[in-house]
């Protein structure tokens, strides 16, 4: 019977491709076959932390990295004014080509695609046997729900209200009701998108060109291996004016966000324009990135103008922005409110609470963004296939990957707003870099899929060989490994000192140098990691009801009963659990073991 994946967005595609790599029998069910793989909001992949996550996806065999490389219109490395540890690769995308490449990934993996609405899960409370659609039952050994904004989706624009996952597509309302009936705790979040503008109606001479860093960077393999063959496209920057803010303020009377129609909380770091006007009244100007949506250059995406205000107000706003005064609107902006599952409804393998073969992925887990959704999709799909094959699911480690950080945050801490990944969320960010993802993710890839591809195996071997050369070769009485720690040391300088390093691929040598440069910080982070790992070895499975443990606070007891952490380490990362609560748990466990 295999694995059934519900949803055809980034999470669903990654789940299906990952599952197919293990069990080979995968069905992806979507409401609209023609819109599989569509990037519903901004036309770009990557960014600070997000780009590193895409590199991690690539090192786990993910589809997004390959498609993003193939559909690239422009490349920029963000955060280069800071250290390499927090650089963020970002690629502008040709949306139509990206969709085509994502569909090709499904075809290459042998995934069956079915167009239908999933109404409910079949099977007893602790195990699903398939999904029920309007056309009948689809049997499955495991199921992944990756419904995105379609789960109970409702759209808003001014006083317009209608059901949908995005403009032009229906919502999965029956599935949301079914999850509630199965006693899952479904909450509501909100997100939004700006108008799409006709590029030929813009005055680009009134805007500033945003220069790119040029082609040649690869998400999906070694950076030097990638050659962009497609057309390049320009991005522009403009700014709103006081008149733009005034137009938005005067249109607030019909705002679903402020008149109470939308109850779900939106993303803090990607607010709507009207939200920015209300939250930052002192700001009279906001930056807008005007981004192409395809190689043909017909439409552009004004990033920073996300809004659910009325059509009339949106037109008034556009008329006040330099370069957009005569813009023709292809589709007006809108907001979408949708269902998601609270902390405690899934564990660190993304398996549903109390259901051995049901997994969740993407925005239904509380995230925001293509990259976060895709990464969760890969993990959920691989684990669903492992369970279907009679194997144990795996979980990523917080100290080894941004995927691990995200999963640990969602399960251990939870979120009160759509979760976005940042480098600041990781205490080990000097190690979790985009350049070393192939070696960092190697162990998890072996755990999930049992093998590394040849390119990744070579990369890891090259890095090991380079580190050995740097330890052995000396200059001025010091090893190259020691010299690499100097602030002015770089890969080119070391290669000049040691000709043997000239034969090493440049990206591998740069990673080896950065590892040495950050080695002191990385050692301290690993020491903290070992402390956490010792706590991870203390199991909590034997504790039935935390309310019976008088040694810990009521708040901690309630939180522990909700989340059911497997280890003391997981409990330590919960926001409601204090150090004194951990001591109480240890005393309780020691007393129980000694009797």
Predicted regions, residues:
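Beta1/beta-strand and adjacent pyrophosphate-binding region of the FAD-binding site
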Residues: 1-11
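Short hydrophobic core segments
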Residues: 6, 138-148
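Conserved N-terminal/central alpha/beta ligand/cofactor-binding core
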Residues: 17-120, 146-166, 170, 174-176, ...
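An anion/pyrophosphate-binding glycine-rich loop and adjacent beta-alpha core
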Residues: 32-34, 177-315, 412-480, 485-487
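Conserved beta-strand-loop-beta-strand element in the redox core of flavoprotein oxidoreductases
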Residues: 122-137
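A glycine-rich dinucleotide-binding beta-alpha-beta segment and adjacent secondary-structure elements
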Residues: 289, 301-367, 394-408, 505-559, ...
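Internal hydrophobic alpha-helix adjacent to the cofactor/substrate pocket in enzyme cavities
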Residues: 373-394
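Extended, charge-enriched "interface" segments that sit outside catalytic cores
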Residues: 425, 431-433, 437-438, 442-595
